[in-house]
Amino acid sequence: RSLIIGKRLQIVHVTFYGSSSTTQRQEIIEVSTFRALLEESGEHIAQSGRILRDNVWGNQAEDAARRDFTINAMYYDPASERVLDYHHGMADIKNKLLRMIGDPTQRYREDPVRMLRVVRFAAKTQFEIEPKSLEPIASLAHLIHDVPSARLFDEMLKLLVSGHAWSSLRTLRDVGLDQGLLPMLDAILEKDGQTSFAKLALDRTDQ
């Protein structure tokens, strides 16, 4: 029932099976341990700054520091029934703000997929991307093409089935991340009068 997956970030998928009077249900629970920030080492970092492998174990505070956005760096302690908020994520949720933890340029270089994630989160939550987190994206967009195709496919699939496909695509184009990720869609959008067709198709996908 347990399967270790991932190369850079290893996690365990634990499968649970349940049933009711009418259906059988399968649920996958994702399990991982706390990780720490990778110490600088050429062995694990590509020339572009992308982290190739960082299975370094740490404590909860260290794990929070290596997360991408403040809203993703909160933990719930069921024993004390408290939310542990290391980077003011609750305040950013109240202000509807997506903020990168640490230096945005460095964090995007470490994992360029974060640029796609911030677009997906912004479209899905209708949060504003904090200016310092938004500013480096246009100049770092080329790093997306160094990411393994399997990871890009997975992230783009999440983006397109998020229920906010058109909004996500529009944000991708606004920040300069769209070219080359979906070549067929690029070709459609570059033709006069085809934008409405693409919007209709993606709106239907959202339904």
PLM regions and their residue ranges:
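Catalytic cores of the polymerase beta-like nucleotidyltransferase superfamily
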Residues: R1-Q207
